[in-house]
Amino acid sequence: MKRRQFIYVVGLATASGGLAIACDTNPNQNQAAPELENELVVYSGRNEKLIGELIKQFEQQTNAKIQVRYGDTAELASAILEEGQNSPADVFFSQDAGALGALQKAGRTVQLPTSLLNQVDSAYRSPEGQWIGVTGRVRTVDYNTNLVKAEELPSSIFGFTDPKWKGRIAWAPTNGSFQSFVTGLRVAEGEERAKEWLEGIKANDPQVFPNNTSIVEALSRGEASVGFVNHYYLQRIKQDNPDVPVEHHFTEDIGSLVNVAGVAILNTANHPNIAQRFVEFMLNENAQNYFAGQTFEYPLAAGVEPKGNLKSLTQLQTQAKKIDLSNLNDLDNTLKLMQQTAVI
């Protein structure tokens, strides 16, 4: 799998201390080229539909020329490690915190200014100040309101291992966001509890789907009672069909894990000043409101509220165990556990 390959590359790069730089015998190449601060190279695990408009706005406001390499978050992180000191990337915009944590642990990210870090709660950025969350992506249990009453739903994600939920659950075990959740479950509750949960859900004969969207669509048709998803998929569907009989349920534990999409400036950045301005831009009020209204994610900069019928981040913080999101990089052991329990 792509994610497994990514973890192996991280380990290799960390052990070897990076890749060697090729030498050039041309003496004219020994002088460093002047930095052009109106240029920026971004490796983005967020697709163009999600951030393309903001990239255009940043270019217009700064008169900068932005080159964006879009792709899978894990593959791009692997590319940064493989490219070593020759990587053209200035900024890495990751779909999840795990990849950011992996690059930090490999020594590929730099300390961000305190003025930037202070804009986001410490729960959603690197404790060492090496990356920062831009938006929050919350795990929820969505449910069909015609099949389940709100008061029937357990306050803990472990409550869904109860046999009364047999045949009523939808999940997507091969989906990256679900695997990140299982990693968070391992970090917060330990290996044995995570194993118990996976085995308990599997014993309840859950319906298997490829992704979050298909789960929410199945819930809307009454094909399942509850499903484990990220919050914004329902928000997007309700934008076009507000009468869909599906609502969010936020458990009072790691079941409401807040993962982040975030950014880091690389230690090989050729354009560090414009890179910092890019991070500042993604955290400004305009960009944060764009994410809240267009992608339905949680804005992480202080003072900007989420859209829709969502719990506040403050409420979610008090419910879910706080973990260092950088530790969500250990997907390899998550995949091993999921294989061991025959979930994948």
Q: What is the role of each PLM region?
A:
Residues 24-38:
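Short, low-complexity, disordered segments immediately C-terminal to signal peptides
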Residues 5-25:
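N-terminal export signals
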Residues 36, 41-65, 237:
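Short, polar/charged alpha-helical segment
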Residues 192-194, 297-344:
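An extracytoplasmic/periplasmic, membrane-proximal ligand-sensing/linker region
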